[in-house]
Every structure is written in structure tokens, then in C-alpha cells.
């Protein structure tokens, strides 16, 4: 039996809310409340999830847990103010980990490469900051997310491809991680919708979706049993999920391509 994990619980909360909105069944709402209470019990007085998180490490991608809790808070009026206060406590701690150039410390899902986090977990963190800032109507969280998102968009548009990891000076290393690319594309889409003058976000999103589509439909992906699947690394022998086709990579790509389709229909 594996111990519960804060980040994984946040992912489940997203799914349970979608199920609750679709079915209206109270069991999902009741389960979500129990899960949220448990998550907040892992938050310390400084705003860190200091217990029961992945590897026992203190990390900033708890923002991606806070965001769905804020969405759920709209269904729990009695808890809303307390949950928002706890959310701010965590988000404020995350901002203490962000440098002036928008790079985030304590953002990797390993110990030995925490000094140069993967874009997969960077994207989780920035997306959570942006959504939480939007839900709380607090520009400081949104601006922190936009700053990091724009830095990575510039890197991508200049080079045509992102590295898999970036250090505190935004120097890249290792192979591109398509999962993180898809996640960033989702974030760039949100930013472009919120600010029509953020042309960089619209351009980066569109270019990334083209790149991901090419990767997912070329080479080995012409075989029927893996057609359309997005690989862990590009090239495939990169260090993240080497020679693998992780389901979450394809999931985020599908989300991003659906955004692209909706954007095209709207414009």
C-alpha cells in the first residue's frame, strides 16, 4: 500500500470536479471535501506542503493542487474563505522561490537535478499560479506565471524547440520533453485568451501544437497500436520517459489541440 500524495490528490480533485459537474452526483462532492481537508492538513505554517508529497520533498508545483481546490471552493461556501486563505499562504511561499528572472527554485521532481527543473514540472507550477491568480483575482500570481511562460515562449520561438531542463539563468540542457511542451501550450492559450495583446503567447501556442502534431504522427507512430501517441522525449532516447509513450503526454496534447480547434472556430 502506497502512502497518499498531495500532488496526486490534486490531480484526482480535477477529475472528481469534472465528474461532479457532468453527473451532479453528490458522492464526488463529498469525496472531494474529504480530500481537500486532507491536503490542507499537509500544509505547514510557512505555506509549504511539508508532509506526504512526492518523494517527501518540498516543491513549488503544489500550485497545481491549489488551483482545483479554489475551483471546488465555489461549491463549499462555508469553507471558501478559509480555503482561499490557505491557498494564498502556499502561493505566497511559492513566490519566495521565484527569482527576478521568473525562474523557480525547488521545482523539479528529483533531488539531484533540482537545480535545473524539467519543463514538465515548471509548466505545472506556472499553470497553477495562473489559474489560482485568475480565481482569486490577484494579479501578482498571474504575473508570476506570465513572466515564466513568456521566458519559455521566447526560448521556443527563437530556437524552434525547447530544452528539457533550464537552470537559474535559463540555460537549457537535455532533450525536449513533449509533455511539458503540451502543458506550456495550454498555458499560453489561457494567457492569449486573457490578453489579446499577448501575441507571443498565441504564436508560441500555435507553433507548439504544430510541432507536437508532427512528433505524434511521424516515425513509429505510424503503427496502428501507437498511432497519435506522444513520446516522453524528443528524440525518443532522451532522459525523460526514454522510449516511452506516457499517457499523460498524449492527454495534454489532446487538451492543447482541442484548445487550438476552439480558437480557430472562435476566430
Residue ranges and their predicted role:
Residues 1-267:
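Glycan-recognition and catalytic cores of secretory/periplasmic carbohydrate-active enzymes
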Amino acid at each position: 500500500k502506497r502512502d497518499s500524495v498531495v500532488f496526486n490528490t490534486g490531480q484526482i480533485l480535477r477529475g472528481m470536479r469534472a465528474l461532479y459537474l457532468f453527473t451532479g452526483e453528490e458522492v464526488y462532492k463529498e469525496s472531494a471535501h474529504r480530500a481537500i481537508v486532507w491536503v490542507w492538513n499537509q500544509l505547514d505554517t510557512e505555506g509549504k506542503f511539508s508532509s506526504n508529497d512526492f518523494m517527501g520533498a518540498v516543491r513549488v508545483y503544489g500550485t497545481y493542487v491549489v488551483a482545483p481546490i479554489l475551483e471546488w471552493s465555489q461549491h463549499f461556501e462555508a469553507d471558501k474563505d478559509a480555503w482561499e486563505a490557505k491557498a494564498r499562504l502556499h502561493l505566497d511561499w511559492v513566490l519566495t522561490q521565484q527569482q527576478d528572472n521568473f525562474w523557480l527554485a525547488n521545482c523539479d521532481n528529483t533531488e539531484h537535478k533540482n537545480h535545473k527543473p524539467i519543463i514538465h514540472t515548471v509548466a505545472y507550477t506556472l499553470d497553477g499560479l495562473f489559474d489560482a491568480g485568475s480565481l482569486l483575482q490577484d494579479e501578482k500570481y498571474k504575473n508570476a506565471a506570465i513572466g515564466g511562460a513568456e521566458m519559455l515562449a521566447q526560448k521556443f520561438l527563437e530556437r524552434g524547440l525547447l530544452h528539457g531542463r533550464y537552470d537559474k539563468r535559463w540555460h537549457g540542457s537535455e532533450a525536449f520533453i513533449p509533455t511539458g511542451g503540451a502543458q506550456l501550450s495550454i498555458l499560453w492559450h489561457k494567457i492569449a485568451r486573457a490578453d489579446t495583446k499577448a501575441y507571443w503567447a498565441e504564436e508560441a501556442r500555435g507553433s507548439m501544437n504544430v510541432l507536437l502534431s508532427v512528433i505524434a504522427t511521424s516515425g513509429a507512430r505510424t503503427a496502428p497500436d501507437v498511432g497519435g501517441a506522444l513520446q516522453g522525449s524528443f528524440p525518443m532516447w532522451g532522459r525523460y520517459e526514454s522510449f516511452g509513450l506516457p499517457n499523460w503526454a498524449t492527454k495534454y496534447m489532446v487538451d492543447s489541440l482541442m484548445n487550438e480547434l476552439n480558437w480557430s472556430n472562435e476566430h
